[in-house]
Structure formats: structure tokens, C-alpha cells
A protein has these predicted regions:
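Predominantly soluble domains enriched in secretory-pathway, periplasmic, or organellar proteins
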Residues: 5, 20-225
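Bacterial N-terminal signal peptides that target proteins for export
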Residues: 1-7
């Protein structure tokens, strides 16, 4: 009887300690920049560097230049956009023809992609690969493309030729949609790419200068032009 009275309180204490530890592990922050908003700042055109700002969810903290603060190097000229995978951020520097890959929660650098890009614009993950819109040489309306990024070794493993001015990019299942704003000119198309075959399967005509897209709950594609 005495043994039973001692055993049950100890069992309760052990269970309470175990649950408490589990809760602490679940809520442990993944990094300094896990809970908040990331803002890409282009920086001055043709010189200097772009930056990234972190704003906490409660708006009480604003940290500017977090990439340089963490890695002691500049991002590159004209930070065009930031795209994400589950654990990584892909920071696209347009004029520098570079994508810096970082841990999205700590902002520690993982890799830089510099080969196979030409005026990169926007990144998205689809079907286990990365896709980046590229304007190419803006004086040449025939060299625009979407670069295919190997997410294991962070290299460009292929390209898909597209029409003038690929800009915003959106993914759904095995399909990628590319809005063609027209670079420095004008366009009115959306390219549809199959990410299994990495082939352009269709081109849709929309309003002039499409600049953003959204899928609704029914899977319909909406294009703002």
C-alpha cells in the first residue's frame, strides 16, 4: 500500500515533466527571422546594393540589412524579389545576375547562383525544382527564358524559352504560369509550362501588361493587367 502511494505521485510528476519538455520543443523559434515579414529593397540602380528588412509580427522590431548583418557581404545590385521553399529564401538580384540562397529563418547563406542567369526577376518552387523568370538582353526580344534550378546543388540545370518579358510566376501542382509584362516594352500573354516535361504547353492572351496572378479556391487563375 505504501509503495502504491509513492508510485502514483512520481508517475504524475514524470508525465508532467515530459509534457512540459515537449511543449517547449514545439514552440522553440526556428531563427531570429521566423515570425515576421521580409521586405526586399531594390537599392540604387546600377550601383550599390539592395537589402532585406525584417519586421516582427507585432511591428515592434524593424531590422534593416539583415543579409549583410548575418553574412558580412552585400546582396548585389537591384534586389528584385524574394522567393521561398519550405526552409530557404531565394533572393534575386536582377542587375548583378545573382540569386543568394539563405536559410529563411536565420538568413545564413547557403549558396549563390551566378551561372545561367540573365536579368533574373522572380523565383518559385514547383514539383521539386526552382523556376526563375529571366528577361535576357533587353535589347533582344527573342532571348527571354525561364531557368530551371536544381534545388539540391543550387545550379541552373536547364532553360525554357519564352516570349518577351517574363515577370511574375505562379505554380499549381505540375503547372507553372508566367505573366509576360513585356520587360521595357509591352506584352499581353501568360505562358503555361508543364513542370514534369519542362515544356511550354500553351500561351494565353490576357490584358495588356499583366503584372500579377492569383489562384482562387476553385483553381481558377486570375490575372491583374
Amino acid at each position: 500500500m505504501k509503495i502504491r502511494n509513492v508510485f502514483f505521485p512520481l508517475l504524475i510528476i514524470g508525465l508532467s515533466w515530459s509534457c512540459s519538455n515537449d511543449d517547449e520543443e514545439i514552440h522553440e523559434p526556428m531563427g531570429d527571422y521566423a515570425n515576421g515579414i521580409l521586405v526586399s529593397n531594390e537599392g540604387p540602380f546600377s550601383n550599390g546594393t539592395g537589402t532585406v528588412t525584417f519586421i516582427s509580427e507585432d511591428l515592434s522590431v524593424v531590422n534593416n540589412g539583415i543579409y549583410k548583418m548575418t553574412n558580412d557581404e552585400d546582396l548585389g545590385n537591384v534586389v528584385q524579389s524574394i522567393g521561398f521553399t519550405e526552409n530557404e529564401a531565394f533572393i534575386v538580384a536582377n542587375v548583378s545576375n545573382k540569386i543568394n540562397v539563405v536559410n529563411r529563418y536565420t538568413f545564413e547563406k547557403i549558396a549563390s547562383i551566378t551561372d545561367g542567369l540573365n536579368n533574373p526577376r522572380y523565383f518559385i518552387e514547383a514539383n521539386g525544382k526552382g523556376y526563375v523568370t529571366n528577361w535576357g538582353d533587353t535589347a533582344d526580344e527573342t532571348d527571354d527564358f525561364v531557368a530551371i534550378i536544381n534545388l539540391q546543388n543550387y545550379t541552373v540545370e536547364g532553360t525554357i524559352s519564352v516570349i518577351l518579358g517574363p515577370e511574375a510566376i505562379l505554380a499549381k501542382d505540375n503547372t507553372v504560369y508566367v505573366a509576360h509584362q513585356g520587360a521595357w516594352g509591352q506584352n499581353n500573354k501568360v505562358s503555361v509550362i508543364n513542370t514534369t516535361s519542362n515544356e511550354l504547353i500553351k500561351t494565353l492572351t490576357v490584358g495588356d501588361v499583366p503584372n500579377s496572378m492569383q489562384l482562387d479556391a476553385s483553381g481558377n487563375l486570375w490575372v491583374l493587367a
